[in-house]
Amino acid sequence: MRVLVTGASGHFGPMVCRSFLRDGADVRVLLHRRKVKGLGTAVETMWGDITQPDSVKRAVEGVDAVVHMAAIVEPMTERKPELASRVNVGGTRTIINAIRDMGVSIPFVYISSASVFGPTPDATECLHPDRNFCNPATVYARTKLEAENLIRESSIDYVILRFAPVPYEKISYSDMKAQMFIIPLENRIEFCHPEDATLAILKSVKHFGTVKCKTLMISGGPSQRIRYKDLVDTALGTFGLPLPPDYKFAKEPFALDWYDTSESQELLNYQKKTLDDYSKDLAAKFPSPMITLMQRFIGPSLGKYIVRLM
């Protein structure tokens, strides 16, 4: 099987590519500027533009499935809404047309976002695509929903996976500083381990007949329903750092919540790992002496000053 992966150079893309490679698939990636880190010649690289029909036509030729992740994300979407629409909506339209023009039916897996629901602080039950209306509050969320609707209205076979936010394999200081404080500490969130997310994508392709023409929520499941402060506390605690002071965090509700993933779990059986597993995985990516130094010495003595500077 040959799988085309768009958006492979993003934070999540290399994991998805490796998942298919481990399963024995050939992976083709459509890249605009950046190479996929750490994969080298393991993937077939095609250079092009997701919004250009010629580029996409060449990329889909001869593939057996398409996983479409390429997108402009926040905060860039809010600064450049026209670019966001051109890539997130226009790029999806271009892929739809290219697949349709192939004249054969292949699995098309679209990676959408739980942000299409909008903020839901008054929700009394876990969110589900079939029960809850979408009320996107950002340019990013609106473009993802518009792309979803294009796919449903098309004549191609598809599955739409609405992902809860998936944390990066590695966390850098710049990532923390840019994103940590935009969500209120008490906001409901549902953790989804990166390996569970990639498994859901892999199984969506391998068992496409069971998920075809569905919109599925992908997240960690009932045991991973927490508050945002729990996620921050766990991530920083890996490095011996305390929770930053409350005043640094946003107060307006964020477009995250708890989700009903019973259908996706029944069909794909992908929920294997937890937030605790992620903390261990995160620590393992750094030298053990560094983690020990942070947890035993730097964190206890300087941690409260470090987090105030974030």
Predicted feature descriptions by range:
Residues V3-D23:
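N-terminal Rossmann NAD(P)H-binding glycine-rich loop of SDR-like oxidoreductase domains
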Residues I72, R93-V139, V159:
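Conserved Rossmann-fold NAD(P)-dependent oxidoreductase catalytic core, especially the SDR/UDP-sugar
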Residues E146-K170:
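Conserved beta-loop-beta element that borders a ligand/cofactor-binding pocket
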Residues I182-K206, K214:
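Substrate-positioning beta->alpha
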Residues A200-T261, E266-L267, S279-D281, F286, ...:
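Mid/C-terminal beta-alpha module of Rossmann-like enzyme folds, strongest
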